[in-house]
Regions:
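Short loop/edge segments at beta-strand edges and connector loops
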Residues: 4-7, 22, 128-131
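A conserved short coil-to-beta-strand element within the FAD-binding core of flavoproteins
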Residues: 4-18
């Protein structure tokens, strides 16, 4: 198999293969694995499958620091975030909102995390960077792992929410078996 990280612009289902358009390039595959996280529904819809996939958005702030202020992760459950010392500063991460793929980041969430972080550690430095991550989520919290109901040559592996790293290896083994028709 091959791994391609590029936007799929079209998908044509043929009798024994799937043709994927990547911009101007078209490639035929015997099977495809859709593991595009929060963007997986775009391809699933091209196949004809519909999933209630949404996006959990989590926010992160990296604070500058010239000294080690904490020696273990610090959780503040009241505000729903953690502070973690990493090599280039202190990361504050947390909070979750269901807001889809296209909505702009919520600056109030970043401001709240910064404000609450400074309550816990007033000696935090300047904000070095901020970012927002998008986790694929489904209403029942269960990931989509398995063959498409519309096309046996399409295999899905997405929707792991907060446990993608934890379930990644197990999902990989299942997908490997499915792709070889061992399951």
């Amino acid at each position: 198999g091959i791994y391609i990280k590029q936007s799929v612009t079209n998908l044509i289902q043929k009798e024994n293969s799937i043709e994927i358009s990547l911009g101007n390039k078209k490639i035929n595959f015997d099977k495809i694995i859709v593991s595009a996280g929060a963007w997986s529904n775009k391809i699933a819809n091209m196949v004809g499958d519909k999933f209630p996939l949404d996006t959990e958005r989590g926010y992160h702030i990296l604070f500058e620091t010239n000294e080690k202020l904490i020696n273990r992760p610090v959780a503040w459950s009241e505000s729903g975030f953690y502070l973690i010392q990493i090599h280039d500063g202190i990361r504050a991460a947390g909070t979750v909102e269901i807001a889809g793929l296209n909505k702009s980041p919520n600056s109030r969430r970043i401001a709240m995390i910064e404000r609450q972080s400074r309550k816990v550690l007033p000696q935090l430095g300047n904000v070095k960077s901020t970012w927002m991550g998008r986790r694929p989520t489904l209403p029942d919290s269960l990931p989509i792992i398995g063959k498409s109901q519309k096309n046996n040559n399409v295999i899905y592996a997405f929707g792991h929410q907060h446990i993608g790293w934890t379930l990644g290896a197990v999902t990989g083994k299942i997908i490997d078996s499915l792709s070889r028709d061992h399951i």
